[in-house]
């Protein structure tokens, strides 16, 4: 007997990929980090500001200390593929959140295939992947907002299985 057909509304997909470079300082290094994100994504990055002053770190409130860019669609999948190649398709179980999203970091952006430029330098970055299913929009839309049912919500186990199957990857840990 043939295997039971999978419900197309239950299929997982990548909602968005957020690339983040957090330096903890503003100035020239931050603008160079923004150039790296622009080269990688083809989009203009947004700067994040410090929420409050921390004198020990030399950070003032509202000072720009990081930059990030949100990528969606096929471009997000292509950039994620390059990031996972750097990690050799190996993530730890603790990289996956209870809500089914996952994230990881890389040490050097040149591992992604970007040519090294001495005027820019080398930056590490974080990849955050937000997963969703068809029908999840009912919880986010403005009009006629609804709730996503318990059986339709995404958990870590769903995402880990999707990750292993799609990328033929390894998840380490218990």
Swiss-Prot record:
InterPro entries: Ribosomal_uL5 (IPR002132), Ribosomal_uL5_C (IPR031309), Ribosomal_uL5_CS (IPR020929), Ribosomal_uL5_dom_sf (IPR022803), Ribosomal_uL5_N (IPR031310). This is Large ribosomal subunit protein uL5A. Gene3D superfamilies: 3.30.1440.10. GO terms for cellular component: cytosol; cytosolic large ribosomal subunit; cytosolic small ribosomal subunit; nucleus. One of its GO terms (biological process) is ribosome biogenesis. It comes from Schizosaccharomyces pombe (strain 972 / ATCC 24843). Keywords: Cytoplasm, Nucleus, Ribonucleoprotein, Ribosomal protein, RNA-binding, rRNA-binding. Pfam families: Ribosomal_L5, Ribosomal_L5_C. The keyword Nucleotide-binding does not apply. Component of the ribosome, a large ribonucleoprotein complex responsible for the synthesis of proteins in the cell. The small ribosomal subunit (SSU) binds messenger RNAs (mRNAs) and translates the encoded message by selecting cognate aminoacyl-transfer RNA (tRNA) molecules. The large subunit (LSU) contains the ribosomal catalytic site termed the peptidyl transferase center (PTC), which catalyzes the formation of peptide bonds, thereby polymerizing the amino acids delivered by tRNAs into a polypeptide chain. Belongs to the universal ribosomal protein uL5 family. Component of the large ribosomal subunit (LSU). Mature yeast ribosomes consist of a small (40S) and a large (60S) subunit. The 40S small subunit contains 1 molecule of ribosomal RNA (18S rRNA) and 33 different proteins (encoded by 57 genes). The large 60S subunit contains 3 rRNA molecules (25S, 5.8S and 5S rRNA) and 46 different proteins (encoded by 81 genes). Component of a hexameric 5S RNP precursor complex; this complex acts as a precursor for ribosome assembly. rpl11a/rpl11b/uL5 forms a heterotrimeric complex with rpl5a/rpl5b/uL18 and syo1. There are 2 genes for uL5 in S.pombe. GO terms for molecular function: RNA binding; rRNA binding; structural constituent of ribosome. The keyword Cell wall biogenesis/degradation does not apply. It is found in: Cytoplasm; Nucleus.
């Amino acid at each position: 007997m043939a295997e039971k057909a999978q419900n197309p509304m239950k299929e997982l997909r990548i909602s968005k990929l957020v690339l983040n470079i957090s330096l903890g300082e503003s100035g020239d290094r931050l603008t160079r980090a923004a150039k790296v994100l622009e080269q990688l994504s083809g989009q203009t990055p947004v700067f994040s500001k410090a929420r409050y002053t921390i004198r020990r770190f030399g950070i003032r409130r509202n000072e720009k200390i990081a930059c990030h860019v949100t990528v969606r669609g096929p471009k997000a999948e292509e950039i994620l593929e390059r990031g996972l190649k750097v990690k050799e398709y190996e993530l730890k179980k603790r990289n996956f959140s209870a809500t089914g999203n996952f994230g990881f970091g890389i040490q050097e952006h040149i591992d992604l295939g970007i040519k090294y430029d001495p005027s820019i330098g080398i930056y590490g970055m974080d990849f955050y992947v937000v997963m969703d299913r068809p029908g999840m929009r009912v919880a986010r839309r403005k009009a006629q907002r609804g709730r996503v049912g318990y059986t339709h919500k995404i958990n870590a186990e769903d995402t880990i299985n999707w990750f292993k199957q799609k990328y033929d990857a390894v998840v380490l840990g218990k």
